[in-house]
Amino acid sequence: MPTAIKKTFAYGAHTVTLETGEIARQAGGAVIVNMDDTIVLATVVAAKEAKAGQDFFPLTVDYVEKFYAAGRIPGGFFKREGRPTEKETLTSRLIDRPIRPLFPEGFYNEVQVIITVLSLNPEVDPDIPAMIGASAALAISGVPFDGPIGACRVGYSGGQYLLNPTVEQLKASELNLVVAGTEAAVLMVESEARELSEEVMLGAVVFGHQQMQVAIRAINELVEVAGKPEWDWQPPAKNEPLIARIKELAGAHLEEAFRITSKQARTQRINEIRKQTFGVVADGVEVPPTGNELKDIFHDLEAGVVRSRILAGEPRIDGRDTRTVRPIDIRVGVLPRTHGSALFTRGETQALVIATLGTGRDEQIIDAIAGEYRESFLLHYNFPPFSTGETGRMGVTKRREVGHGRLAKRALIAALPADEDFSYTVRVVSEITESNGSSSMASVCGASLAMMDAGVPMKAHVAGIAMGLIKEGNRFAVLTDILGDEDHLGDMDFKVAGTENGITALQMDIKIQGITKEIMQVALAQAGEGRIHILALMKQALASHRGEVSEFAPRMLTMKINPEKIRDVIGKGGAVIRGLQEETGTVIELQDDGSVTISSVSAEGAQLAKEKIEAITAEVEVGKVYNGTVVRLLDFGAIVNIMPGRDGLLHVSQIANERVNNVADYVKEGQAVRVKVLETDERGKIRLSMKALLDQPAE
């Protein structure tokens, strides 16, 4: 029997166990992580050789949730897990981002990391165990990897940081931050906050990095007893003569090219320089250098040109200094028949953002392994190939689009109105029509404007900005509002979104080690300046939300009824509610607590439906006079309808002062009559009288 090797450590209020050696033994590395009964299996398999002609690092990370982990059977016809959910896609990205920069430069062997959720404690999100498991599996596999990493979640409540709060604790927390890093440095941050200060956010990152050291130590201890031999892999030796030759041929030309401020013109010129340089280098050589070798050297030369100029204090690629935001142009209400729209342009990045209002029936129903839930705020980010002047496939939503949409959504949640104040379902779509860096933050700005334009009573405008970093030794420069090239050639991508009052979302991806607390402090402060500048421009374009929703949006009315009256509104087989909806042209939604939502394109129709529901659910009052209709004659009286769904008995003795021998001599079916309520009993039966009225008017 195989023997499992285990390492256990306390992690906040949780106990975490790392285990290897019993399951998935044919994988390059396999670790089971148990965090208070949330259990994941993380496996790593790597190809021993890179494919011929491979010119990038083919790392794949797949996080997979199994319904059996929560004791559930999947819905749908096939009753099995299907394509990745949004949660699976986002968690896969969360794992990928901190481990990718730790593989050595020039390592092009295919690596696949698969994390499978085997058991779920509803109070423990599997994402942190999954990140720890992926790190541990890589560490014991022997694959070239400069880890391990640790990861943890940080909450903030009552002025105190919480380590790995439960799902229930997070509901009351002002912060939901995931941080990952090595023993020496933070590599990745993903967070959502309720307008917190830069100091609190930075403190959370530092707190998380300190606390994750226990996980890193446990992984290192596991490697000592269960680690496989490290691969005998060496990076390709640098061809110094070739590097010098390419620099001689292309260096001066690249210096000039990176002074071209237009992205398309600059890209075209760089491509020309690359083509000319490679042609000259390969000409007349017996063994020409490989494409990978040439590409890597040219990339390093590009990076050197851009980075050295910025660190020397020279203007950036587009002529700006390090703190200036690109020119911004804002238009709202650009699409006449949509509920709300905005066109947000920042330099060569542009987002056309549309807000649509719907009813409760438009909420997204999500069948997660922990149980079904509904989302009333949706944000979708689309990045078509034409936005960068390229061709490409359409149709399938890419992981990057899911991730950018989620970041923008998290940035806006803190500013949304409460459900009881605004019961609409809101869907925002960001169409990126031009891109040269920071399109996700343009989506945040555009979404805030579009929702305000749609009449959504946002608490405040939300703006986002992307920061970059260039660092060489002890010299560094933080860049405000980075371009695509600065993101590609820099050391950090640092996105911050928030209101005037504080930060609502922070995302950080760091490609190098050695980013200190002081550098992050400078970056956050500089991002705050940029955010306030953008917010001022947004307020100039649209200071507050529209006074009312678009004429094309559904009108919503909400009311509360006695839950015991719900069946009266629905009627037998749904007949009453169907009739109401057809008569008034509305959609009526009932909740178990008696909440009623009425939606209609017509405000008059919604009001009419509300009045009719009030009539149906009104309580019959003893002593009150009603105008009723005779619905049926009996030998001993008549049945009279006095309110929608409420009938009473008009006894023969209560029809007239004299003796009534034949009811039909006094009332007919369909006849309008005035009656007084004499009595109602505990079973809801109603006794009526015509005789008691005499000449009393109907109330």
UniProtKB/Swiss-Prot annotation:
It comes from the Bacteria. CDD domains: KH-I_PNPase (cd02393), RNase_PH_PNPase_1 (cd11363), RNase_PH_PNPase_2 (cd11364), S1_PNPase (cd04472). This is Polyribonucleotide nucleotidyltransferase. One of its GO terms (molecular function) is RNA binding. Residues 554-613 form the KH domain. Involved in mRNA degradation. Catalyzes the phosphorolysis of single-stranded polyribonucleotides processively in the 3'- to 5'-direction. Mg(2+) binds at residues 487, 493. Its EC number is 2.7.7.8. Its cofactor is Mg(2+). The gene is pnp. Belongs to the polyribonucleotide nucleotidyltransferase family. Residues 623-691 form the S1 motif domain. One of its GO terms (cellular component) is cytosol.
